């Protein structure tokens, strides 16, 4: 079991440090199914989850929303028929914080038990 999926987010302010290159290299190994994307000049973590239909995709979206609310850290979510794209980044620092990796791992944990996964 991944230690990240047991961790909790810390408050992240605009002056919080982004992950270093060394931290990035270490943390990304713990969430191997996630991709680093660069948008608007900052890094984001993104993964696409496939489902059998819209109902299952929407249920997963809502489950991710629940963990986001509980941690006070919110992703970008795009819900389509049979597909959910989840994107984590720290808006306040315009980049990646340890919180984003924690939430990727927690999203993976939700996906493990999600109904209707392809």
Curated annotation (Swiss-Prot):
Ordered alphabetically, the record's keywords are: Lyase
Instruction: Say yes or no: keyword Zinc-finger present.
Output: no
* Protein name, entry field: Putative pterin-4-alpha-carbinolamine dehydratase
Q: Which reaction does it catalyse?
A: (4aS,6R)-4a-hydroxy-L-erythro-5,6,7,8-tetrahydrobiopterin = (6R)-L-erythro-6,7-dihydrobiopterin + H2O
The record ties this protein, via Gene3D superfamilies, to:
Transcriptional coactivator/pterin dehydratase (3.30.1360.20)
Q: Which GO terms describe its biological process?
A: tetrahydrobiopterin biosynthetic process
EC top class named in words = lyase
Fetch the PANTHER family from UniProt: PTERIN-4-ALPHA-CARBINOLAMINE DEHYDRATASE-RELATED
Family the UniProt entry places it in = Belongs to the pterin-4-alpha-carbinolamine dehydratase family.
Quote one Gene Ontology molecular function term. Answer: 4-alpha-hydroxytetrahydrobiopterin dehydratase activity
Give a single Pfam family match.
Answer: Pterin_4a
Q: What is its EC number?
A: 4.2.1.96
Q: Which CDD domains did the record assign? A: PCD_DCoH_subfamily_a
């Amino acid at each position: 079991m991944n230690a990240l999926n047991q961790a909790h987010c810390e408050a992240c302010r605009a002056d919080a440090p982004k992950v270093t290159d060394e931290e990035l290299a270490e943390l990304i190994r713990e969430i191997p199914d996630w991709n680093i994307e660069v948008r608007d000049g900052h890094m984001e973590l993104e993964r696409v989850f496939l489902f059998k239909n819209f109902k299952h995709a929407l249920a997963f979206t809502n489950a991710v929303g629940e963990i986001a609310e509980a941690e006070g850290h919110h992703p970008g979510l795009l819900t389509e028929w049979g597909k959910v794209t989840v994107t984590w980044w720290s808006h306040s620092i315009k980049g990646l914080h340890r919180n984003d990796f924690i939430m990727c791992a927690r999203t993976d944990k939700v996906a493990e038990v999600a109904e209707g996964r392809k």
